[in-house]
């Protein structure tokens, strides 16, 4: 069966079918509300750091440190959510993160020392590190397995609206104060915590049969799984470089916060359009999932290099457009492939590891932008992209025919 076909017809029909499920629509809305603070994080942290210290570089450190915390916590948190009531645990974790983000807002307004700002950013990220994986676990209990790929495709498109709304919301509220973006993140995170409790019934999430217990003992790690984690890492690094650099790139072009937001909106709009086309037409695309992923990784790098030229608006816009066109299709490809490579009973742990790998990529992007000159930082992903693309040629790392 193709990635985008099911036993009852083509993907277009399955997209309509999954959208007709009330439980999926509730999950979709809740998932976006949970993700919205993540979309707000880069610009909100940069502006909070600028308001507190007068320099955006502390924001890069906060982003890198928070992403590193997610890497360390995502897998253990995923295991916890796998073995407990995912809804209740995710809700409490989100409430805790909302409190910490509120404290970070106050700390930024009072210009607390940078180490404390970084510490609060790390704590908030640690609390929410496993929640995206938990939401994926809840999705698996919300839609039939045959509708999972269409559900992911729709989700991948809708995510881009969140990517657009996040920076726009930050830009709107920072007119009040530079720390208002993080304050809005706190409020939205608290609202997401409340909505998570109204999702799939607990028995769909926590019931554990003897067969599930046995499945937990199955191996999780395999060479193809490691390869796809690497693909997720490199993709996140390239996307992160484009997103986090939007504000300094806008400044080099003579613009400001609004210019940065518009660049991010362009990226997100391109990603949403590409994701929609990919969800409906990927069955007609040539090559395997791995081959398509490699092509999109190369496309991401081309876009980032164009951004790095800082040669005026045309090349910068082209760079953000190319990055956007590759983003949603690549994310959908990675998630759907990881889903098939792991035992179902360890899905949340696997998605936690995927979150961790993308967190590493995002941390590398934030660290590069904090420590290196802007142009050097932007081309830093060339090395990791080259290594990842070369690794895909190794026979031992390739999935079997039924997994591509």
Regions found by a protein language model. Give the residues of each.
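Cytoplasmic helix-loop-helix junction between adjacent transmembrane helices
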Residues: 120-161
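Intracellular juxtamembrane helix-capping segments at the cytosolic ends
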Residues: 45, 129-143, 246, 329-342
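Helix-to-loop junctions at the C-terminal end of transmembrane segments
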Residues: 70-86, 174, 273-289, 373
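Helix-loop boundary and gating motifs at the non-cytosolic
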Residues: 9-71, 219-265
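C-terminal ends and interior cores of transmembrane alpha-helices
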Residues: 95-111, 298-311
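A late C-terminal transmembrane helix in Major Facilitator Superfamily
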Residues: 345-374
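C-terminal transmembrane helical hairpin of 12-TM major facilitator-type secondary transporters
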Residues: 288-332
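Hydrophobic core of transmembrane alpha-helices in multi-pass small-molecule transporters
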Residues: 32, 113-130, 233, 315-329
């Amino acid at each position: 069966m193709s990635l985008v076909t099911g036993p009852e017809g083509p993907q277009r029909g399955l997209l309509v079918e999954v959208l007709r499920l009330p439980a999926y629509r509730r999950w979709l809305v809740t998932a976006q509300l949970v993700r919205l603070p993540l979309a707000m994080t880069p610009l909100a942290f940069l502006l909070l750091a600028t308001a507190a210290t007068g320099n955006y570089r502390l924001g890069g450190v906060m982003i890198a440190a928070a992403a590193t915390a997610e890497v360390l916590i995502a897998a253990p948190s995923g295991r916890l959510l796998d073995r407990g009531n995912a809804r209740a645990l995710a809700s409490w974790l989100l409430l805790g993160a909302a409190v910490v983000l509120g404290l970070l807002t106050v700390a930024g307004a009072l210009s607390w020392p940078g180490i404390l700002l970084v510490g609060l950013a790390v704590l908030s990220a640690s609390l929410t590190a496993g929640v995206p994986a938990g939401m994926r676990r809840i999705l698996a209990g919300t839609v039939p397995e045959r509708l999972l790929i269409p559900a992911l495709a729709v989700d991948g498109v809708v995510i881009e609206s969140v990517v657009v709304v996040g920076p726009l919301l930050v830009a709107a509220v920072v007119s009040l104060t530079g720390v208002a973006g993080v304050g809005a993140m706190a409020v939205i995170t608290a609202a997401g915590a409340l909505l998570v409790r109204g999702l799939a019934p607990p028995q769909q999430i926590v019931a554990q049969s003897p067969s599930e217990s046995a499945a937990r003992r199955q191996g999780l790690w395999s060479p193809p799984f490691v390869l796809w984690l690497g693909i997720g890492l490199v993709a996140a690094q390239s996307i992160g470089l484009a997103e986090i650099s939007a504000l300094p790139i806008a400044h080099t072009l003579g613009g400001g916060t609004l210019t940065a937001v518009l660049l991010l909106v362009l990226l997100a709009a391109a990603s949403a359009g590409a994701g929609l086309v990919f969800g409906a037409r990927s069955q007609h695309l040539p090559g395997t999932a791995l081959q398509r992923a490699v092509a999109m990784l190369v496309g991401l790098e081309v876009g980032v290099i164009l951004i790095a030229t800082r040669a005026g608006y045309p090349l910068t816009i082209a760079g953000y457009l190319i990055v956007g066109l590759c983003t949603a299709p690549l994310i959908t490809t990675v998630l759907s492939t990881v889903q098939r490579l792991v035992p179902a009973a360890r899905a949340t742990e696997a998605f936690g590891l995927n979150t961790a790998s993308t967190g590493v990529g995002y941390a590398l992007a934030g660290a590069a932008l904090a420590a290196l000159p802007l142009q050097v930082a932007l081309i830093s992903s060339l090395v990791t992209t080259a290594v990842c693309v070369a690794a895909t040629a190794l026979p031992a790392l390739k999935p079997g025919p039924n997994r591509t």
